Amino acid sequence: MAQDTALHLPLGLEPAGWALALLTSSIIYLFLSPKSKSPRFPVVNKYWWDFFQAKAKRDFEAGAEDLIKLGLSKARTKPRREYPRLVLSDQLADAVGMDNRFDQDKGIAPVNLVTLKGFESMYAGALHDSVPRPATSATSKRLVHLTRPFSEETTDFLQREWTESPDWHDIEVYPVISRLTAQVLSRAFVGPRLCRDTRWLEIATTYISNRLTAVVAVQKWGAVLHPIVHWFLPSCRRLRAQNKRARELLQPELDRIKESPLEDETFTSLAWIHGYGQGYIYDPGLAQLRLSAVANHTTSDMMTKTLIRICENPELIQPLREEAIEAVRGGGLRVAALQKMFLMESVMQESQRLEPFILLSMFRYATETVTLPEGTTIPKGTLLAIANPSRLDPAIYPDPHKFDGYRFVRMREDPRHAHLAPFTKTNSTNLNFGHGKQACPGRFIAVNQIKIALCHMLLKYDIELVEECPSQLVRSGLVTVRNPGAKIRVRRRQEEVCL
């Protein structure tokens, strides 16, 4: 039988210091939805005497990955207890991912607080909630037209932020990458005017952390008080003000779209959603905030980790440059050129294999009782998620804890594992983008955007790690990030080809 366990994750943890860790608090709450009905599986991190969950909170924040491993190992024995969230092994990812009876929206609903004013951007069922997936898919189909605009925004950003100076200077990695990602993706989301507007970029880079801060603040109070306290909490007021500001900034762009519909060459998801939503009442500001929440954080995290990995392994820099030069020479920086960059993709994928942003994936809700092919029965109402132990399976990845930038290049040449090599092809060993029918439709955009950015960075700049600023992994609950204070040192160099 596949391994599965019910993982007891404590409610109300608020990590301090920086915004990314706030996501942990929301995920903790999600795992303790009191309305869920879990099957009889082993429970970990639950103590009968821990009435206020103090020990459970500390243990989860410090060692969520170890708790997941413990739960999966316990699942080899007879199921014995009940608790809210069921954690399944990735052996069941195919079955869960392809079954429509496991609902994604309801799987993450406990953290959304969607009935409160200001939190509506995640509201399940509203048009501004249902539109991001088809809008993202539509954007992915325009990648051939978006490659040049993405490159233009990357050039503009690096000239301003990394400068043209030939002297070494320090760059704080995550904040800079977050701003770069926001500007580039906003070119596809809201167009060339707003993508460089500092007012919009401030919203794009802070919305998700502001929302999560507000969620944590509300969750400190009993559920019966939520409809009242949110009106007075400063974080909730800031969130409502940010929603209002987003609408104000988007309205002039919407007016232009109504007067002159955009062609593929100037495609924006804002224009696409406007056409998609004809005849419906919807909030374009909330729709764009939802897209930003989905895209900016995870893409920035992936690019940050990849860039730091490259700096930690400087022997990769020249081969990566040579691959990019060979791919770009003759045809320019096009989708076809990006698809030839197998080493760059391997480095990105190896980084994500070892450093997934979230240790669990595929959060789902069972809308009816489901018996999986291997015999596990999931009762109706169960909240579940998928762990990904296969990413460290030595039978698939020899020496699995070692970073190997060429790992997936070699896998492409191995008939046994060639199907696992493409980064954007989801499978049970690679759940970074989810899996199955509800896999992330924006993964093609994210991978292309990161490749474009890395081409510009590596060809135009010398880069090295600033050793005095620790760049180690920081774990908080389910979230794994690089130290937000990590820095690299850069200086301008002459690129060999024109980008």
UniProtKB/Swiss-Prot annotation:
Glycans are attached at N296, N427. The chain crosses the membrane at residues 11-31. Its cofactor is heme. Its EC number is 1.-.-.-. Heme binds at C440. One of its GO terms (cellular component) is membrane. It comes from the Eukaryota. InterPro entries: Cyt_P450, Cyt_P450_E_grp-IV, Cyt_P450_sf. Its main location: membrane. One of its GO terms (molecular function) is iron ion binding. Notoamides have been shown to exhibit antitumoral activities. Notoamides A-C show moderate cytotoxicity against HeLa and L1210 cells with IC(50) values in the range of 22-52 mg/ml, but the IC(50) value of notoamide D is greater than 100 mg/ml. Moreover, notoamide C induces G2/M-cell cycle arrest at a concentration of 6.3 mg/ml. This is Cytochrome P450 monooxygenase notH'. It comes from Aspergillus versicolor.
